[in-house]
Amino acid sequence: MWNTLSKTPSPCGCLALCTKALHQIVVCIKIPKLKMKVYFYHTRLTTESYLEWQKGLFPGHLLYGQPEMEKYGIEFVMHPYRHFPSRLRLMLYVLCAVLKRRSSFEAIYATSFRGLELVIFLNALGLLRCPIYTWHHTAVTTAKSVWRELPSRLFYRGIQGMFFFCQKHIDESLKSVKAPAHKLHLVHWGPDVPFYDGIMKSASSPQVPVFISTGKENRDIQTLMQAFANLPHRLDIYIAEECGGINYRRVIESQPKPDNINVHYTEGVIPHRLAQIVAECSCVVIPCLDFPYTVGLTTLVEALALGLPLITSRNTYFPMDIDKEGIGITVPYGDVQGWADAVEYIAGHPDEARQMGRRARLLAEKVYNMEVFGRELAEVINSRQS
């Protein structure tokens, strides 16, 4: 409204004009979406591994997709890893580390809940008020004792989302009241393909069949060595002296060791060096003990990325059907003759073995890789903002 005496806008008119102009300015300015800050909890060296990944010396899938998720507007606060032999001391340290940084993140992403238990209980009691998303490496089960089941139910209330490697774990978890379907997410965990592309550039193919076993968790080394004892083919074993209560040195030294079997004891986490060695072999062998989870999956996805055929124990928790996909041969648990036959088949059919390797690589490129599962994880974690 105009003041007819002064011919100048009234105060109300000025306010309206200013508001309109301000609205036009705001519309023209594209306000960037703020990144979601997430606390990244890992059970091994975190920042150091990330820096190695940036240099191409560490595979990103062992960081459980953290580098890939940065593409989707997630900024990570790294957990300051420290090793503790005592589980209680670990839990207390993790609790202090999380509470100290609580104001700097909106959610927690964990590769395992080991060490995070006190944080999860606080969240369940409403004292932390922070969404927690964690990988669950086995199925959620119901305790036989009510005194164990009751605190367990409280514990799982503190977790907003769980990521699983295979559908079988989800199906088994759904039998428990602690695992409602909306909390369970199947993720196509797979290799950091560009990392292995760099490895393969300098790798050379063996002139004779070379079989290799890596990994240290629940491996059936006894069956594997017995299978190779009467075969002419070379087997290289890379394994820790002891892991998870199994003394592999003792197991190996109790077996006859012919000249075609070479054993190398490893220390620490050396994925880059092991990948270089595996890339120059003919076939990856994964002898597993019978446990209800994805024993050997890390070794398996590495073989996919390197385009190598597989011989594995028939682990029904693997996310893919190895025989059906045509990427290798599976053998029943503890079947020495079955292993020997599979090795002879791969060695005697090199063209078919190469085809298995090509199909394995294609599976990594299309389905099981860090680009795919990083996006899947980010979609779940980012969903709380929508």
Regions inferred by a protein language model and the residue ranges of each:
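A short, histidine- and acid-enriched strand-loop-helix "catalytic/donor-clamping" loop
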Residues: H83, P131-V146
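Membrane-proximal helix-turn-helix segments that form the acceptor-binding/catalytic region
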Residues: C96-S103, A143-F163
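Acidic anion/phosphate-binding donor-loop and adjacent secondary structure
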Residues: L174-K175, K183-H185, P191-V208, Q222
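Conserved donor-binding/catalytic core segment of Leloir-type glycosyltransferases
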Residues: S202-R219, L224-D236
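Nucleotide-activated donor-binding/catalytic signature segment of Leloir-type glycosyltransferases, i.e.
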Residues: I239, Y248-V278
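Acidic donor-binding loop of glycosyltransferase active sites
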Residues: V278-Y293, L308
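Conserved acidic donor-binding segment of nucleotide-sugar-dependent glycosyltransferases
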Residues: K324-V336, Y345-D351
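A short, well-ordered alpha-helix in the C-terminal region of glycosyltransferases
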Residues: Y345, E352-K366, E376-E379
